[in-house]
Amino acid sequence: APVPVICVGNLTAGGAGKTPFVAWLFDQLASRGRTPAILSRGHGGSATGPTWVDPAIHDAATCGDEPLMLADGRDVLVSRDRARGARVIGEGGTHDVILMDDGMQNPYLAHSMTIGVFDGGFGIGNGWLIPAGPLRTPLAEGLARLDLAIINGTDETGFGARLPGSLPVFLAELRPDAS
């Protein structure tokens, strides 16, 4: 990609809070003078992309519910081909960083940084791979790809203690937006 790519994903199937974290990270970067764009596959939508999401003309059936939610005041590109989407963002000259929502298992786009988000109440479940468990990839292999881990909510399973000591770990908490 022509600009840095920060991948936000998780090692387990199901919700861990990745999308709200991507929204928060976008807003933090923008408030510091960066011009991020979000790259999403558009799960659940019919658009194959690359398509810039416009809430005024797109709906969840077209671009997916998460990209539509993220596009509220943010630049979001849906592209099933993540590498092509990253090129479109980078070559546009407007954005200086790409936030890839849920792309840890995509081997076609190099990441400058990979952030893993984990649900503190769920951890890694039974620790088994899909279909016997929730893991998308073997645990050691997935953890080796991470540059940073976010535990969303209270670490009820003790998963944080199992993370490598060299991996920076931060605790986060989802709060409803009152605005």
Question: Which stretches of residues belong to each language-model region?
Answer:
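ASCE RecA-like P-loop NTPase motor cores
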Residues: 171-173
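Walker A (P-loop) phosphate-binding motif
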Residues: 1-58
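Phosphate/Mg2+-binding loops and adjacent switch elements
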Residues: 42-167, 178
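Proteins with a high burden of low-complexity, intrinsically disordered sequence enriched in S/T/G/P/A and R
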Residues: 1-5, 11-12, 78, 156-157, ...
